[in-house]
């Protein structure tokens, strides 16, 4: 996705709906209509607001950001790009040009939820999650919490776990403790 692509164009793109359902779901929660009509996908990421939806989704999807300076192009993983509140790994002479997101397949599970005072307000807390479906359950869990920390944060306990229905409550309890 090009960095200057408006939120509304991402939300209305058939390709996003088909191959990036996590983004398709979360983009509808971004701000209010005026912001979605004028704001850009890359702008949300470069701004690095810890309560914003797109940084969390980029981390959950293991996105790569393409940064361009006069002399070179650099690729940075989303998890390494966000350093803190509105602070990124972008150098002063660079601009964010492209966001590379791996397509989600029918074997990929995802979830997105945020809690805010009203629709369009900043998230008080939210979660973006991805996983791979296997016959035994879910693997490669990436559960990213946002809105309550300095930057989107991956739950290390969830990332190191596989999930079958019988141990879902146990994992949920461990993740809650990890994030406390």
Name these PLM-found stretches:
Residues 1-180:
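C-terminal structural segment of proteins
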């Amino acid at each position: 996705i090009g960095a200057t692509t408006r939120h509304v164009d991402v939300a209305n793109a058939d390709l996003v709906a088909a191959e990036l359902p996590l983004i398709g779901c979360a983009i509808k929660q971004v701000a209010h209509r005026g912001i979605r009509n004028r704001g850009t996908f890359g702008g949300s990421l470069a701004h690095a607001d810890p309560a914003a939806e797109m940084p969390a989704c980029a981390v959950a999807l293991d996105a790569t950001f393409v940064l361009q300076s006069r002399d070179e192009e650099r690729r940075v993983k989303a998890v390494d790009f966000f350093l803190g509140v509105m602070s990124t790994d972008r150098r002063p002479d660079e601009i964010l040009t492209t966001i590379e997101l791996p397509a989600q397949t029918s074997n990929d599970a995802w979830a997105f939820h945020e809690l805010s005072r009203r629709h369009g307000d900043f998230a008080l807390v939210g979660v973006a999650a991805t996983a791979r479906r296997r016959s035994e359950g879910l693997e490669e869990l990436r559960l990213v919490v946002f809105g309550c920390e300095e930057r989107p944060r991956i739950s290390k306990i969830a990332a190191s776990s596989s999930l079958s229905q019988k141990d879902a409550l146990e994992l949920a309890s461990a993740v809650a403790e990890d994030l406390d």
